[in-house]
């Protein structure tokens, strides 16, 4: 229903403002724990399975062996949720792919789509508060800004690569401890 949809938008805005306030005031707590990264990402993918547009495939691409990583799973899911939501809104054909790579000291988690892409002159601006590619797009334009701040708090970085009409890839690189699941 329209009321339920608007309630969800308002709740998301309130949560974004609260997160932004916590980050700016230094009160955002990270709670790293050992998690199976494949399982964590699969949970996020499952939450978006019902939002995949017709003509779009939601894919995963993980290493052959699962990895345990020491990360804040709640914040990773928050970041991935933002990336997935944006990718699914901007992809009408093709696919959206969630992937990760792990080495001994870091992890790279990303979302790649075959959507409309982002103009080169907007790539730096998309991480600014209240910045949206379209004035008619839903949301307050805080999601990517919050993601970047959280990743920086984790001593990581956000990378974006995009070409108009071809697609966009968002990747977070984070230092972390990891081990293979036997």
How does the language model describe each region?
Residues 118-130:
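Short conserved segment of the HATPase_c
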Residues 5-10:
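Short alpha-helical segment of the dimerization/phosphotransfer core of two-component systems
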Residues 21-32:
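Helix-loop junction within the histidine kinase core
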Residues 31-36, 53-67:
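Conserved catalytic submotifs in the C-terminal HATPase_c
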Residues 143, 147:
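Short alpha-helical Gxxx[C/S/T] motif in the catalytic ATP-binding
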Residues 31-46, 77:
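A conserved beta-strand-to-alpha-helix junction within the catalytic ATP-binding
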């Amino acid at each position: 229903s329209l009321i339920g949809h608007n309630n969800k938008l308002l709740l998301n805005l309130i949560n974004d403002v609260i997160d932004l306030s916590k980050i700016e005031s230094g009160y955002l707590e990270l709670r790293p724990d050992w998690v199976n990264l494949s399982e964590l990402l699969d949970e996020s993918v499952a939450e978006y399975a019902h939002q995949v547009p017709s003509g779009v495939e939601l894919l995963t691409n993980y290493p052959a062996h699962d990895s345990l990583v020491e990360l804040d799973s709640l914040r990773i899911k928050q970041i991935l949720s933002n990336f997935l939501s944006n990718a699914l809104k901007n992809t009408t054909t093709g696919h959206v792919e969630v992937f990760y790579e792990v080495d001994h000291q870091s992890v790279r988690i990303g979302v790649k789509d075959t959507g409309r892409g982002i103009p080169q002159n907007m790539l730096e601006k998309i991480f600014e508060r209240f910045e949206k590619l379209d004035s008619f797009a839903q949301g307050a334009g805080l999601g990517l800004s919050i993601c970047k701040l959280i990743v920086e708090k984790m001593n990581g970085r956000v990378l974006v690569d995009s070409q108009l009409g071809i697609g966009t890839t968002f990747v977070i690189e984070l230092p972390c401890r990891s081990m293979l699941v036997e």
